[in-house]
Amino acid sequence: MLQALQKLLGDPNERKIRKYLPVVKLINSLEIEIASLSDAELRAKTTEFRQRLDRGESLDDLLPEAFAVVREAAKRVLNLRHYDVQLIGGMVLHEGQIAEMKTGEGKTLVATLPAYLNGLTGKGVHIVTVNGYLARRDSEWMGQVHRFLGLTVGLVQEGMSTDEKRRSYHCDITYCTNSELGFDYLRDNMATDIKEVMQRPFNYCIIDEVDSILIDEARTPLIISGQMARPSEKYLKAAQVARELIRDEHYEVDEKARNVILTDEGFEAAERLLGVSDLFDPKDPWAHFVFNAVKAKELFIRDVHYIVRNQEVVIVDEFTGRVLPGRRWSDGLHQAVEAKEGVPIQNESQTLATITYQNLFLLYPKLSGMTGTARTEEAEFSKTYNLEVTVIPTNRPIRRKDAPDLVYKTENAKWKAVAEEIAHMHAQGRPVLVGTTSVEKSERLSAMLKEMGIPHNLLNAKPENVEREAEIIAQAGRKGAVTIATNMAGRGTDIILGGNAEYMARLKLRERLMPKLVQLDPDNPLGSASTTSRGGGQGFGPASPKPKKSWTVVSPNFYPCELSARTSQALDEVVAAAVAKYGLNRLPELVVEDLIAVASEKAPVQDPLILQLREVYNSIKAEYEKVTEAEHEEVVRLGGLHVIGTERHESRRIDNQLRGRAGRQGDPGSSRFFLSLEDNLLKIFGGERVAKLMDMFRVDEDMPIEHPLLSSSLENAQRKVEVYYFDLRKQVFEYDEVMNNQRRAIYSERRRILEGENLKPKILDYMRKTVEEIVRAHVNPELPPEEWEIDKLTAKMQEFVPLLKENLKADDLRDLSYQEILDHLIKQAELAYEAKEAFLDTFEPGLMRKAERFFLLQQVDTLWREHLQQMEALREAVGLRGYGQRDPLIEYKNEGYELFLEMMDNIRRNTVYNLFVFTPQLVQVPQVAQAVPAQAVAASPETGGVVEADFAED
């Protein structure tokens, strides 16, 4: 029915694409005219466009000509010309949509079109990538187009100074990572001086791999935290208790919700083992520790969710299979896993500032993104982010054949069939990529292939395999290659049929340069300081130390040919030149990695050594390409890359990403998934239906099962998971929306304080409100005056404003009305404030203004931190109210709002009180000191030294 309707009305995506075709035609018609311009005339177009914007033309008016200018600039600078489909992609991005573009279709080049057009406004364009390497590569490579046309291009990287970042954020186009962008946003909202603020107001953002950031990472909060000590012995005892407790007797595991529930017997057993009467005793709480210990035991599996390296628990990204050094699970969970593994337990942290990617990117007035797979998540992009998905046609037709799934009764039978399929393809000479879902499963298959004598490469989160990522990917498309990869989806690298000559040339440079340039570890003179490789696997931390470090590729016959005598000599000469310039074994490993990366990219450079390195790199690449291109043709004839999936992922999108590794840029290829009724997806989400199917199919284990009921069960299971996780993300979004509204309010107020020249009117308003509160607490106008608490009121006012101790008497207020008392006390407080200001002016003119800003920021930051903890506790508490027929979200909104109002009142009261009670302390300092946030600094006229006015309270 749906297909018939689509046929009648036409595919909505096709209709969308058709509306862009007249604009593509117009851009193409301008090509000859724009090509005739000189470089200077082409560059002058930028000034012309900006003037036209000033005169009232819109970006849409400029689009055809601006796109034609970018296309011409890319031809001249990069020797790349935008295809028509790439122009459509650029228009989709400019309109604030998501462009789905298949692997190898040139997403990076597409982004130059809307980035240039929107960069003309001068309000800033952010191009966001998933790692620092890609951000730098794109800023240097694609940035050439923008620089050629006269736009400024910035790059934000981890470890840059505040000034460097500010300069980059103030460029027309800024390349950065999603995490650095988010952390800088939070840092800006913790700044104590407007000079520390790095970012401008957000304008337009293009996200590369948008599904990875807005869907997969949506529930991951960015957190800036401070250390908070927590007793490690509690984690260790809780881990011992968890080991004693028995599943299904003492606790139940909800794998779908990734949670554990203790039974009554479980509570009794835990209390008995710990020697306590109540796990929830507020004076000695144990419940949180025990729950986390049981979660660590049942739900967090070594070599699946984390690995242990150098006595540390390191998280493995479930989507990409990469390790995430530096990331920690929150809420004591990481400590529970550390206790389980018997490694040192690190301190918990207190949240100082936090935001989710969902709310960070919703701060942009215009947002767009690119990815190879977004259609399956179209509903979520639309509902959560108000983003439309448009599928961009490929430049060449897709030739990949996707075979139907083969489903086996048992897991053993499935793995046996996978191994046989690999052997069959390997015998034909076709390269094979096998996707697995965990380190453990990849090693199981590897062991089977070893027994069968099939050579293969293993790519998973284990340090020894991480090191070889570039080497493995470089040859994954070669004839007869077999590659087993854990969660290949997020690896962000193309598999090129016949082998990747660029990677191979880079590895040859690395093999020769690293042993000569990298500094030696004094404790390990045979090896380097670190065993980390970044040659294609950014984002990995240091691996376990090895007795000797070698950068030589492991695979025999890795390089497609021996280098010619001329190129070998040029390589020897450039290595000698590098040693002459930098010294023998003097550079950190990452510096040498960067040197090789810059030499092998296309970005413009001035350094003679890098230019020499680049020349040698290009010679090596050219020699390798002669062989790899011939092999490419042979592999194409054999049928291209064959992709094998060994389990359905929870998301169809991730399955599609794995399939998409085959058939890039019009190459042939094929894919097939091998599944079993014992796979996690079917076990957890297929439920009883699958159990019945298992009884129904009384067939031999080695026979694949094909049945409409089974296919629908699979699809239903996957859809259930997608809906389940969408609901989870939606729930996170709804709860975080409450926090987001509060965050926006407090950050806006904070920015006004930071930017405000004169905060005195705000402080006087705070003071009047606080005096009114004090009066209302002690004087009720509806009661007779003899019942008013005048003595208590006087004492409270004297406590609040110490300067009134001498002048304010209770007897002065007894015969006054409520309004007269209020007016009199406000007047007295104002006079006291003026007196305090005059007193401070004797130390330094304008010192009161500095004090106002200091105390306001101090109170906002301190009370916001406490508020974050209260909101976290509230969120945990309201979860239980669902059992009482009350909506937890509404309860969270209402009580969260009350907590927020209370925090704002406390900011007001505390700031005014601190301003009245603080006393400057004079400290003679022999020379100009560094500014300290808690101090105001003024020159001493007598000595020319510095007087520090410390904002100390009495």
From Swiss-Prot:
Catalytic activity: ATP + H2O + cellular proteinSide 1 = ADP + phosphate + cellular proteinSide 2
Descriptive protein name: Protein translocase subunit SecA
Pfam families: P-loop_SecA, SecA_DEAD, SecA_PP_bind, SecA_SW
Keywords, in A-Z order: ATP-binding, Cell inner membrane, Cell membrane, Cytoplasm, Membrane, Nucleotide-binding, Protein transport, Thylakoid, Translocase, Translocation, Transport
General function of this protein: Part of the Sec protein translocase complex. Interacts with the SecYEG preprotein conducting channel. Has a central role in coupling the hydrolysis of ATP to the transfer of proteins into and across the cell membrane, serving as an ATP-driven molecular motor driving the stepwise translocation of polypeptide chains across the membrane. Probably participates in protein translocation into and across both the cytoplasmic and thylakoid membranes in cyanobacterial cells.
Quaternary structure (record): Monomer and homodimer. Part of the essential Sec protein translocation apparatus which comprises SecA, SecYEG and auxiliary proteins SecDF. Other proteins may also be involved.
Molecular-function GO terms, alphabetical: ATP binding; protein-exporting ATPase activity
Region entry Disordered, spans: 520-549
Record-linked HAMAP family: SecA
Subcellular location: Cell inner membrane; Cellular thylakoid membrane; Cytoplasm
GO process terms (BP): intracellular protein transmembrane transport; protein import; protein targeting; protein transport by the Sec complex
Family: Belongs to the SecA family.
EC numbers on record: 7.4.2.8
